[in-house]
């Protein structure tokens, strides 16, 4: 959950009472006064000293985890990753992007994976307390990944944008036909957009510098806005 939920911190509430009752029964499980937290893979600024250090910790740990998955993956079968994360998007000079998704996708790509698709799965109840009156996810997004070929080609930024504009409309139409909730569309569109981005070993800008994941996400969101605007232009007055 990146920085959304600190399960180790929450577990301390129960741990102290369990330890009091059970440490003589299962002493090996209750050797510490509180829940161990150093290996928990979350981006908690107070634990690491700053947001940047917390982000670096998450990126490094997630890269190592994903690399182990990539090393064990069989070429005949995809790896599916369940990553239920919702974060308010940030506006920068590069466009709109989400740090949680950016960091997770960066780790996935660094591990040698290419994203081949996404599947939105309705996992959340519409009447749950957390979701009432808020813009929370109605579905969770499953990413489908495969090892990126060692001979994957490079592309220019213009070629990447052209491919996005060519392929994203069909992908969005498919997602909409699957009855995905509108609040989840931007999250789900990351998959087909990143499928284009990760098919290349690198996407280079006009100066020959590699396009970052944040820049790619901003371009995907921009293209998504264009696709949705075109769809609205086709509606009749009643719609």
Stretches found by the model and what they are:
Residues 1-239:
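S-adenosyl-L-methionine-dependent nucleic acid methyltransferase catalytic domains
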